[in-house]
Amino acid sequence: MNPIQPIPKSKIEIRIKCKDLTSKDLLSQSDPQAIVYLKQQQRNDWIQQGKTEKLKNQKSPEFKQSITVDYHFEEVQLLKIVVIDIDKDIKLLKDFDDHDLIGEVNVSLGSILSSPGGRMKMSLTKNGILSGSITISTEEIRETGANIYFALEGNHLDKKDLLSSDPYFKIYKSGGTLVYQSDVIKNTLNPTFPPVYLKLEELNGGDMFRELTFEFMDWDKIGDHDLIGRFTTNTDTILRGGALEFEIINPKKVGKSGYKNSGIIKFYIARIQGDPTFLDYLHGGLEINLMVAIDCTASNMPPDVSTSLHYNTPTQPSQYASSIAAVGNVLAPYDYDQMIEVVGFGGLYNGHTSHCFPFNLTNGDDNKSEAHGLQEVLDIYYNNVLKIPFSYPTNFENVIHHAIKRASKSTQSNQKYTVLLIITDGDISDTQKTIDELVSASKSALSVVIIGVGNYHFEAMKILDGDEKGLVDSKGNPSKRDICQFVPFNDFKNYPEALAHETLKEIPSQVLSFMKLSKIHPNQPRQFNC
């Protein structure tokens, strides 16, 4: 017998709800969030396993975001669950202080799993004083590798407000575990809800016939939300297709004279599908925007000198122009309006060194830094590079910060992703500030590709790439995902197609990582009109 065999393990889904939390604020309820830590026995340390979403003004929150942990029967797995009210991102226990804490509990995973229904209710305490209760639900995840996608609409829902209702719905799997909560649709009795996209095991634990309860509520700004009605079904029924309709019933109205239902719910899409691909997002209308940032520091040499990296001739474009053309030719077709922003950094602008300024100096309007199409980008570059006084140092912080603001507009209905192309001739002098911005940018719909021109060694750029070691900002926060790619121009200077390939090859996976992080799924494919 081989004593070093892989130890079987299961994945356990943990869901949390709390009741009667004490408030940290005198005039309002807390904005709670739960974080789950697992004790690392060898290091006697607590490692974060995951966290729920933050809920606004909730005394008794029921969190919809679950946390997944690996289960090892042969180990004592001690969990610490903390409920906090804090705005900043939390990774380590030391990242919050006593003032941020609402309450906490320590419990072994085995104790919860062996409780009836895999569920345990406990007291939350802070410094030994009761601060509420917590119910922890666990369930083994039977991974199917499949996802369920469905969409529904309501008709003639009950009026809960003076003129209408503000409906939303929750999905519970048997045992009363919340697995999904929709957005609120304001002022309507005939809502069309955004499509639902879930891992199949999240919805039903891998059991196609497990009972699901759809509960429809009317949102109220103040006070408890009102029940409109509910119905029960299972995944198998939802997927049968056709015009599947359900009556939603309010139990308090059953038996009253003339009562039939509180509305009709219709599923108009329902299907099983694998993980979405990059093309799924493109077909659903994803737009990829390009932003170009050009190094205007003095180390490039004056652009009218033949040794300058910005020196252009009719037969030999500069490495900057070649880089713009190589990357732009690939990305331009994915940009529907063909508007490409062009900025400079490290040059004099309005008499002062600027690390992010509009490259087009001829129009005199800071809001007109965009070019229409790739050729106009090159025209702006050729027409303005001789007019910009070069300065120093080389800093990326401002350019990336500007790109983050541009890229922060991607939503489920309006899917956009920005690729920032930075072309530079040397290392930066603001490495840590740039890393801080890249870590911040990892939460946005943004990728950063850096092309290094000239013969510099670019050691700092290899750090920014982050392939060997993930980026961590100055506060200890790790990057949410890999978004930066560095490529030296000289490795591909005679092969523009290869330069574009090497520069952009990670973009599809980076788009997918952002969509997964943001829980944005592909929209329905756009229809071709003859």
Swiss-Prot record:
The residue ranges of the VWFA domain are 289-507
* GO cellular component assignments: cytosol; plasma membrane
Q: Which cysteines are joined by disulfide bonds?
A: none
**From its record, what is one biological process in GO terms?**
cellular response to calcium ion
Recorded GO molecular functions are:
calcium-dependent phospholipid binding; metal ion binding
One Pfam family from the record: C2
Q: Which UniProt keywords apply?
A: Calcium, Metal-binding, Repeat
Q: Could you tell me which Gene3D superfamilies the record lists for this protein?
A: C2 domain, von Willebrand factor, type A domain
Which residues bind Ca(2+) 2 per the record? D25, D85, D87, D100
Residues reported to bind Ca(2+) 1? D25, D31, D85, D87
Cofactor(s) needed for function: Ca(2+)
Name the CDD domains on file: C2A_Copine, C2B_Copine
Q: Which InterPro entries match?
A: C2_dom, C2_domain_sf, C2B_Copine, Copine, Copine_C, VWF_A, vWFA_dom_sf
C2 domain residues: 1-122, 130-248
The domain of life is Eukaryota
- Family statement drawn from the similarity comment of this UniProt entry: Belongs to the copine family.
The protein here is known as Copine-D
Gene name per UniProt: cpnD
